[in-house]
Design a protein with these regions (language model features):
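Amphipathic alpha-helical hairpins
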Residues: 1-196
């Protein structure tokens, strides 16, 4: 597979990721308790729609269709965001979970755009690099805005009393079981040494 083919695959992944976010951001905006977060997510929705349009221009420049690939990574990150929205938390603690999910989303996109820009630069695709850099700059700015807005929210959350432990839901039990399986697969020898 040539580098251009890899780039096209990566771009299709980003196109899918951005389209998934167009659907997810209104839910984050609606779910957030903090007015500043609501506003940030709503504003970023409009930016994301613009990013989708820029990606369409990239594909036009390449003479390729943008569709045909689903971004499983973004689907997983969005699923974590849905989990944050379903938490039985209140106020700043609830919003802290949403902030974490939003930052994971932004950094996933940042990594994707940086990879695409590197490939397009290597291939000498200046117009495409310019379009992708516009998207990257917006993602970097969005991550910074979320981090800045999140600072006071997290401080407020840290000051809140810890809630009493509740029984785990079925989803949380399943997640804990999968986490344990991941640990065993990733580092069985280390776990064996710790157990002995």
């Amino acid at each position: 597979m040539a580098l251009k083919d890899v780039l096209i695959d990566e771009l299709r992944d980003m196109y899918s990721a951005e389209n998934q976010l167009v659907k997810a951001l209104p839910k984050l905006a609606k779910g957030a308790k903090n007015a500043k977060l609501k506003q940030l997510f709503s504003a970023h929705l409009e930016e994301t729609k613009g990013q989708v349009e820029r990606l369409k221009k990239v594909f036009l420049e390449l003479g390729e269709k943008p569709t045909g690939q689903h971004c499983n990574g973004m689907e997983g990150v969005i699923e974590e965001g849905k989990d944050a929205l379903e938490k039985d938390e209140e106020g700043a603690s609830f919003d802290s979970g949403i902030i974490g999910a939003a930052l994971r989303t932004e950094h996933y996109e940042i990594a994707g755009y940086e990879a695409c820009i590197s490939m397009a630069t290597t291939l000498g695709m200046a117009k495409i690099v310019k379009l992708l850099n516009s998207n990257l700059k917006e993602e970097l700015a969005a991550a910074k805005k979320i981090t800045v807005a999140g600072g006071p929210i997290m401080k407020q959350s840290a000051a809140e009393p810890e809630a009493p432990k509740k029984p785990k839901t079925g989803k949380e039990k399943y997640s804990a079981m999968k986490s344990k399986e991941d640990e065993v697969k990733a580092a069985p020898s280390i776990l064996d040494r710790l157990a002995s």
